[in-house]
């Protein structure tokens, strides 16, 4: 066998090297040292950045949430049992992104954009948005000027919400917080059905953070029944999902909502609820060995909510005039709104709707305490017809609450005070409203106009709900034309004639 000379070997190697045309990929690769409770400790990710997405050998993704000289702490978004000690980890060079677009409407997805409803893969997305982005600046915004109708009389009349506002829904468990958010989503159907273009519609996102799977299923079922699923995205994380996924959920959903906002459309997002989100972040921070502060929350727990809620905005006309309205939900313990997380979120938002368990158990639903609830910017978005009625309502209810305190102690009241007390009781009855029965603005104005008029003084307090149902039925059947022009034209006197006529015949 003849030997091969070294010159020939060098020649062959030189030819191979010169003809090599394959792509060369340079990257930072590390090795998993340990995995525990959704946190992986990785060695060797040189040049990696804080918040950068990494890919494990199993395909699971994670985000770098802690950096030391040679060690990185990675939060795993998925099942940590799929990540093993010794697995390779590769930096992607990108921040966390989620799919966005119209194809997500009507679907139930995870915070990573994966379908959870069993209806197959999601195709035709309009791209991807980063989960963490800077909130719009001062010059990128404009004042809230358009109303967002909830269909709930107490809110639309007394605590109005505008497009681009952040309105907190706060109260004890089982007081109807989610019910208010769902009614608001369902009420958008009447406006979306008659919208002239896509830019006139209000798209909705419901974010379930650490909720029971049965509760999420009930919400999805109700949205489908009401025909609201077509314009709604449900981003779901159950109580059994990993803590990092629960933490990621509101940011991912906000990125999906920003697609509509940045394209000149309107979006409503419900965070249900941020109390569980704060607990998930506390758990994650303790696992990352960050120093605990008050109630064992880390020092930046305020910042995680402020940077999320500041992304809700009404953009300037130069940027398309789109809006993202946020309805965060906070659960209190025994009505204590002075606790750490509630006070944080109250200070970030533009107002709060406060629900009381005492009112709920008395049968006043929605159980909104009008005295403690406030909307700091929404009144600028109210239409004229609503403002006229709402102004007198606020005064009547304030006088009623003051007189009620006197009456409770058995104080003698004169005839005018007694009449005011009776009027307040009737007004309170008219503010009651069943769940999943939102009213149009015209219907709300008609009911509240009746409540402020003396024509109802002869009707017993217990019959006010029946009176309201009868009045609305009559207006829908016999006076549809009057209702249609109620907001544009001054037809208040004509409407009062109809109301007084019905009150006499009731």
Curated annotation (Swiss-Prot):
Record has Transport as a keyword = yes
Reaction(s) catalysed by this chain, per the record, are: ATP + H2O + 4 H(+)(in) = ADP + phosphate + 5 H(+)(out)
Q: Which GO terms describe its molecular function?
A: ADP binding; ATP binding; proton-transporting ATP synthase activity, rotational mechanism
- Primary location recorded for the protein, binned into one broad class: membrane
Instruction: Identify the InterPro entries for this entry.
Output: ATP_synth_asu-like_sf (IPR023366), ATP_synth_asu_C (IPR000793), ATP_synth_asu_C_sf (IPR038376), ATP_synth_F1_a_nt-bd_dom (IPR033732), ATP_synth_F1_asu (IPR005294), ATPase_a/bsu_AS (IPR020003), ATPase_F1/V1/A1_a/bsu_N (IPR004100), ATPase_F1/V1/A1_a/bsu_N_sf (IPR036121)
Query: In UniProt terms, what function does this protein have?
Result: Produces ATP from ADP in the presence of a proton gradient across the membrane. The alpha chain is a regulatory subunit.
What are the record's GO terms for cellular component? plasma membrane; proton-transporting ATP synthase complex
Protein origin, superkingdom? Bacteria
Question: Where is the secretion signal located?
Answer: none
Identify the residues that bind ATP.
171-178
Q: Has the keyword Iron-sulfur been applied to this entry?
A: no
The family classification in the record reads:
Belongs to the ATPase alpha/beta chains family.
* Keyword annotations: ATP synthesis, ATP-binding, Cell inner membrane, Cell membrane, CF(1), Hydrogen ion transport, Ion transport, Membrane, Nucleotide-binding, Translocase, Transport
Name this protein carries in UniProt: ATP synthase subunit alpha
Question: Into which EC class is this enzyme placed?
Answer: translocase
Origin organism of this chain? Anaplasma phagocytophilum (strain HZ)
Q: How does this protein sit in the membrane?
A: Peripheral membrane protein
Report the locations given in the UniProt record.
Cell inner membrane
Return the annotated site residues (Required for activity).
373
Q: What is its EC number?
A: 7.1.2.2
Quaternary structure, from the entry: F-type ATPases have 2 components, CF(1) - the catalytic core - and CF(0) - the membrane proton channel. CF(1) has five subunits: alpha(3), beta(3), gamma(1), delta(1), epsilon(1). CF(0) has three main subunits: a(1), b(2) and c(9-12). The alpha and beta chains form an alternating ring which encloses part of the gamma chain. CF(1) is attached to CF(0) by a central stalk formed by the gamma and epsilon chains, while a peripheral stalk is formed by the delta and b chains.
């Amino acid at each position: 066998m003849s030997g091969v000379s070294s010159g020939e070997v060098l020649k062959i190697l030189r030819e191979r090297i010169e003809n090599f045309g394959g792509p060369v990929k340079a990257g930072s690769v590390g090795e998993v040292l340990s995995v525990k409770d959704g946190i992986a400790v990785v060695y060797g990710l040189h040049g990696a950045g804080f918040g950068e997405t990494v890919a494990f050998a199993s395909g699971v993704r994670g985000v770098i949430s802690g950096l030391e000289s040679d060690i990185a702490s990675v939060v795993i978004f998925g099942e940590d049992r799929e990540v093993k000690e010794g697995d390779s980890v590769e930096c992607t060079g990108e921040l966390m992104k989620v799919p966005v677009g119209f194809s997500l409407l009507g679907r139930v997805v995870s915070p990573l954009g994966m379908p959870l409803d069993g209806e197959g893969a999601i195709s035709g997305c309009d791209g991807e948005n980063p989960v963490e982005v800077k909130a719009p600046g001062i010059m990128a915004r404009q004042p809230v000027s358009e109303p967002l109708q909830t269909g709930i009389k107490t809110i639309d009349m007394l605590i109005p919400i505008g497009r681009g506002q952040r309105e907190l829904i706060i109260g004890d468990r089982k007081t109807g917080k989610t019910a208010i958010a769902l009614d608001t989503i369902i009420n958008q159907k009447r406006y979306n059905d008659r919208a002239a273009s896509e830019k006139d519609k209000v798209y909705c996102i419901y974010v379930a953070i650490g909720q029971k799977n049965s509760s999420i299923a009930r919400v999805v079922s109700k949205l489908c029944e009401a025909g609201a699923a077509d314009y709604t995205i449900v981003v779901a994380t159950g109580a059994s999902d990993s803590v990092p996924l629960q933490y990621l959920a509101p940011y991912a959903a906000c990125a999906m909502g920003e697609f509509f906002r940045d394209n000149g459309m309107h979006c409503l997002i419900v965070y249900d609820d941020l109390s569980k989100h704060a607990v998930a972040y506390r758990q994650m921070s303790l696992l990352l060995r960050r120093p605990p502060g008050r109630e064992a929350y880390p020092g930046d727990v305020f910042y995680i909510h402020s940077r999320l809620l500041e992304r809700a905005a009404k953009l300037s006309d130069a940027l398309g005039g789109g809006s993202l309205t946020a309805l965060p939900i906070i659960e209190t313990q025994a009505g204590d709104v002075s606790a750490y997380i509630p006070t944080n979120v109250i200070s970030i938002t533009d107002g709060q709707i406060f629900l009381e368990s005492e009112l709920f158990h008395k049968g006043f639903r929605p159980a909104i305490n009008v005295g403690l609830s406030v909307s700091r910017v929404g009144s600028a978005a109210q239409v004229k017809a609503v403002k006229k009625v709402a102004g007198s309502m606020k005064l009547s209810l304030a006088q009623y609450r003051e007189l009620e305190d006197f009456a409770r102690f058995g104080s003698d009241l004169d005839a005018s005070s007694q009449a005011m007390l009776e009027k307040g009781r009737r007004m309170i009855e008219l503010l009651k409203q069943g769940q999943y029965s939102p009213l149009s603005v015209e219907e709300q104005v008609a009911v509240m106009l009746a409540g402020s008029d003396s024509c109802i003084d002869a009707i017993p307090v217990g019959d006010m709900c029946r009176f309201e149902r009868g009045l609305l039925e009559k207006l829908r059947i016999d006076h549809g034309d009057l209702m249609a022009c109620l907001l544009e034209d001054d037809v208040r006197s004509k409407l009062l004639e109809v109301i007084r006529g019905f009150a006499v015949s009731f």
